[in-house]
Amino acid sequence: MSSPKKNFKKPQPKTENQKQALNEERIAELKKSRILGKNRPFKKMIYVDTKAQRKQKHENVAFLKTLQENKESDVPKKRRGRKPKHAPLKEKNNLKLFDILEGSLKSHTENDDTNKVISLLVEVWEKKNKKKDNNSLSNKDIVNVLSKFELPDDEIIFVLDELRDKGIELPHDVEEHIHEFRANQDLSIIDEDIEELTTKNISNRDKVDDNVRFFLGSLDSSKMLDFESEQRIAKVLNSTDEESRKYAINQLVTSNLRLVVSIAKKHLERGLDFNDLIQEGNLGLLKAISKFNWSLGNKFSTYATWWIKQAITRAIADQARTVRIPVHMVETINRLAKAERALNQELGREPTAEELAEKMGGQAEGFTVKKIAEIKRLSLDPVSLDKTVGHDEESQFGDFVRDTDAQMPDEFTESRSNYEKIDELLNNCLSEQEELIVRMRIGMPPYNETKTLDEVSQKIKIPREKIRQIETKAIRKLRQAVRNNHMSLSFMRGNEKKD
């Protein structure tokens, strides 16, 4: 006897409202997982994303693409004219939601650099697949392509997901390898700087001697620490154990020596030798270690960069010039130089003082035409008077500089003759006391400079008022003698010193 057949109900097709409800639930889940929200930090992704999570993310991306296709096919063309006021708001809300999804998808599709990276990696994979029948990309291949572009962390994740969707096998630790490369990407630049400075064909202009080259060669063992290691060592700085503190300081110093060299190289040709710049940068590094607060979560190399730059800049301001210029004025000179270069490129000619003053902020910032001329005069480097000039190098720069204080020969002869006549008048017309006071007040030999009433009073022990009366009487006698002999005492008036 055959068993009765079971009645299986044929599944009914879902209505449009049911489909829309499922879509809204799925979108709510995506929002909760922050797919449509802010991108997660790249670092956290490395240690949180598992294989199952990546699979779920691929499904989410595929779902978003499906929604985008449905939107393009289902949404009817907009009717011309105004929409009736009684039109349902649900359609409007759906359009906004689709616009959000569209923006989320376009954020990746409209990035040219992201598409270039994907195409380059696919080309590398195709070449390897043809030669070795290899269906995978190595960490080195991926890093070599990413190093040519500056992509944010979320774009890198998108690139890796696209490669997996295309069936390309990636190493299991690719995210961690990329993160390590991005954390230490400055090291390659610093290594190139050190290699350039340690080459045998280095020019004398860089002022690198054998001792500095030996120091640069020893930096191969100086490796920058990652963030976790910096935090662990920085905590030891607060230790009460002196040996532990010394160890932590030594680790932070040795791991950042290449950073000091890289910054010092950018300040060459500013008046200090390269070894002096390195030494000042090391002092700034030690200052940064003493001020560093690990609890704020900052990377030490980023924090130390500003202290190193400040130490080098102050050293250049204090030591590079024969006549010291204040640090704030050095910064103003650098600002003016940058403004002048910018205007030169913009206008195609040398900017005027008025244009420079306006570029620097004008009257509101205190920059006038006179102030600009003053700053330019301060920025000039001093030149030695003994510097040789000319092709023969027998002449000196001082030979061509005019001495404004020197007298012409005829002026000197006339002045000497007048002094001899005045000396004779003083001896013949005045008493010893009057002659002494007049000589001190006018500055005649043996007194080579004029003296005030107070100085004369202290010298000869006579009150100021009495000295003034004696001087007035003596000058009256001399004027009478001059009138009688038809002489001139005009040159004496310039030598008198006001009280």
From Swiss-Prot:
It is found in: Cytoplasm. InterPro entries: RNA_pol_sigma-70_dom (IPR014284), RNA_pol_sigma70 (IPR000943), RNA_pol_sigma70_r2 (IPR007627), RNA_pol_sigma70_r3 (IPR007624), RNA_pol_sigma70_r4 (IPR007630), RNA_pol_sigma_r2 (IPR013325), RNA_pol_sigma_r3/r4-like (IPR013324), RNA_pol_sigma_RpoD_C (IPR012760). Residues 1-12, 77-87 have a biased composition (Basic residues). Residues 1-25, 68-89 are annotated as: Disordered. GO terms for cellular component: cytoplasm. A motif (Interaction with polymerase core subunit RpoC) lies at residues 276-279. Residues 252-322 are annotated as: Sigma-70 factor domain-2. One of its GO terms (biological process) is DNA-templated transcription initiation. GO terms for molecular function: DNA binding; sigma factor activity. The keyword DNA-binding applies. SUPFAM superfamilies: Sigma2 domain of RNA polymerase sigma factors (SSF88946), Sigma3 and sigma4 domains of RNA polymerase sigma factors (SSF88659). Residues 425-480 are annotated as: Sigma-70 factor domain-4. Sigma factors are initiation factors that promote the attachment of RNA polymerase to specific initiation sites and are then released. This sigma factor is the primary sigma factor during exponential growth. Interacts transiently with the RNA polymerase catalytic core. This is RNA polymerase sigma factor SigA.
